[in-house]
From Swiss-Prot:
Binds 1 FAD per subunit. Component of the sulfite reductase complex that catalyzes the 6-electron reduction of sulfite to sulfide. This is one of several activities required for the biosynthesis of L-cysteine from sulfate. The flavoprotein component catalyzes the electron flow from NADPH -> FAD -> FMN to the hemoprotein component. NADP(+) binds at S519, R520, K525, I526, Y527, V528, Q529, D561. Its EC number is 1.8.1.2. InterPro entries: CysJ, CysJ-like_FAD-binding, CysJ_Proteobact, FAD-bd_FR_type, Flavdoxin-like, Flavodoxin/NO_synth, Flavoprot_Pyr_Nucl_cyt_Rdtase, Flavoprotein-like_sf. Coiled coil: none annotated. The keyword Transit peptide does not apply. This is Sulfite reductase [NADPH] flavoprotein alpha-component. Its cofactor is FAD; FMN. The lineage of its organism: Bacteria, Pseudomonadati, Pseudomonadota, Gammaproteobacteria, Enterobacterales. It comes from Salmonella typhimurium (strain LT2 / SGSC1412 / ATCC 700720).
Amino acid sequence: MTTPAPLTGLLPLNPEQLARLQAATTDLTPEQLAWVSGYFWGVLNPRSGAVAVTPVPERKMPRVTLISASQTGNARRVAEALRDDLLAANLNVTLVNAGDYKFKQIASEKLLVIVTSTQGEGEPPEEAVALHKFLFSKKAPKLENTAFAVFSLGDTSYEFFCQSGKDFDSKLAELGGERLLDRVDADVEYQAAASEWRARVVDVLKSRAPVAAPSQSVATGAVNDIHTSPYTKDAPLIATLSVNQKITGRNSEKDVRHIEIDLGDSGLRYQPGDALGVWYQNDPALVKELVELLWLKGDEPVTVDGKTLPLAEALEWHFELTVNTANIVENYATLTRSESLLPLVGDKAQLQHYAATTPIVDMVRFSPAQLDAQALIDLLRPLTPRLYSIASAQAEVESEVHITVGVVRYDIEGRARAGGASSFLADRVEEEGEVRVFIEHNDNFRLPANPETPVIMIGPGTGIAPFRSFMQQRAAEGVEGKNWLFFGNPHFTEDFLYQVEWQRYVKEGVLSRIDLAWSRDQKEKIYVQDKLREQGAELWRWINDGAHIYVCGDARRMAADVEKALLEVIAEFGGMDLESADEYLSELRVERRYQRDVY
């Protein structure tokens, strides 16, 4: 459970002032913070004449530096809960987002705790990429005086489960750090593991660190600490789906929907760059198929989080059915003694491949068995919400939120299958129907504070979504900064998402440049990374003029290919080798001039 962030209306500072104050005090020791506090007290309470001050005996209190490296918000919530636990224990703690951490100070850390998620092919979350690169570079310092602990969040449906946490843990040890605790790797259902780990961290730190006076306990963080809303992941807003429009052509191989959701008078606020969390209901037809394959009826009572529910209801609302994992396959094979699946158990690569290509219902179809209802429930993972990059700005749409949804559809031996959340939004929620949503704030994907700063946006496919939000915001504010969009998809006539809007922005001068890559409209495939290389000289001029670069879309292939192209452009037109170009791009990332929202 996290402690609610302070209501901005009750703070004497505005968000920008609060952010500057936090940035200015991040690196201060407790003694320095105490001095600054006394200094400001003296400014507010001037006295005439000399005042004798009795010095307070200096007390050395090792500070616990707590780094949150989050992609979807889960790692941040765990870190915030640990911060609250440490403060309650009167321990001196500084909480900082990985993107705000000045990693060159890591050599001076005495007590370091990292809570991290993993994205893509085992990569660190975006806000931790620079720190990760630094630790794995030749510049990384020895850490013989640092004691550390790592909590890693992941998803066993991915091959490189918790790889980011494994990387940080092994590298900190390799650099000479002392493990306070063994690393914990947590799956999607991480809450219980996180709660136990937090208690252990508090215990071990209390045994090592002198207790700080409560008045000297300090917690700092990024600007997202000031976000507050009565609607959260665990208490979502029941909103109304008002528009469901297919925005790909009749002959397109893709089914992409423009979804508009009415937030009513909820007061729910978001910024360009944020994501919308959507809770969904599994397809009742899929539930019926799975239940019948296991020779069950659906009305069998099962226990879910201490409550008794009918099996069908539990499957529809509480468990993941459309994403299989290696753990589920292994457990099902062991439980049923399946002759076809047991040989996979000893082969990690084959097991992972099978899970990635065979939905749960088809695993049961191909390897039938009879399970009781509770055994089935115990086999599955809890349902989790899906996050979609927001494609609108409230400066234009007010009490609405828009998202761009690529509907997942495929066949398994002639049987139609679909993604859980995307098909729920596209096929099963009627217009004016209810949908449970919340805002996942993303302060690592924000427009420049200076409206005159040029912006380069790279977003193929549904990665276009946040840039629609960006342009709505910049158009509404009438900003003068230049905007350049790189977009790509298979076909111009079928897959040009929001075509009329982009053309209008070009005509109005809001969008300064647009480069389009259609991969299937000619013999040679052309992608956005090819357009980046083609426009390399002009791209470098924009970067030299202070442009911010944004990338959104597929993490597995596109993001890596785009980064490679950017490095080549920087090396060629910046007159440097690839290693120097990589350092240059890392500096842009640290300066928040290179931001990615990849998934």
